[in-house]
A protein has these predicted regions:
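Phosphate-handling active-site elements
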Residues: 29-38, 66-87
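Polybasic, low-complexity association/targeting segments
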Residues: 1-15
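C-terminal binding/interaction regions
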Residues: 85-160
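Acidic-glycine-rich active-site phosphate/pyrophosphate-binding loop
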Residues: 26-44, 110-115
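Transmembrane alpha-helix interface/packing and boundary motifs in multi-pass membrane proteins
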Residues: 44-52
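Short cysteine clusters
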Residues: 18, 56, 104
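Conserved phosphate/anionic-ligand binding catalytic regions in large, soluble enzymes, centered on
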Residues: 52-64
Length: 160
């Protein structure tokens, strides 16, 4: 079985930010020619939205994936909007149940916002940060969610 959680974990260790790592674990949801664009679009959500420490980037990455499945592009399509927002809230509740919050600063035990300067990815960084594990958990929760919603098969692959 595919393990998208492990994929997200490994992408984070390769240097992608938390949001990008989750999106990369679901890269097959996007056209291959658009991957650079998707990575650019997901990049501001790392660090709880540009290190503002708001919504966890792994949750935002999952929301981007959910948007690729349930999103809408017609103004005023209230039915599709309702479905998307409902799926987002369901996912957020699952993540929060597992982790206690969807807010970056809460998950990291920080107070307030951070500087815009990203920290260097050293061994000490990975020891003190739950971010790789949160990438794994978010992508795994999303995988189970998408299986339960009939989007992925039991092997974790997109249903044809």
């Amino acid at each position: 079985m595919r393990n998208r959680g492990e994929e997200a974990y490994n992408y984070f260790l390769q240097g992608y930010n938390c949001s990008q790592a989750v999106v990369m674990a679901y890269r097959d949801f996007f056209p291959s020619h658009a991957l650079d664009t998707i990575l650019s679009l997901s990049s501001p959500f790392g660090g709880g939205m540009g290190r503002l420490r708001e919504v966890c980037g792994t949750v935002s990455g999952a929301f981007i994936v959910l948007g690729s499945v349930y999103g809408f592009n017609v103004p005023g399509d209230s039915e599709k909007k309702k479905i998307l927002y409902g799926k987002m809230q369901e996912f957020a509740a699952l993540f929060e149940k597992e982790n206690g919050s969807i807010i970056c600063r809460d998950l990291l035990g920080l107070k307030g916002r951070s500087t815009p300067n990203p920290e260097e990815r050293t061994k000490e960084y990975y020891k003190k940060r739950p971010c790789p594990k949160l990438c794994l958990l978010s992508a795994s929760i999303l995988e189970e969610f998408l299986i339960n919603n009939g989007v992925l098969d039991e092997e974790g692959e997109i249903k044809k």
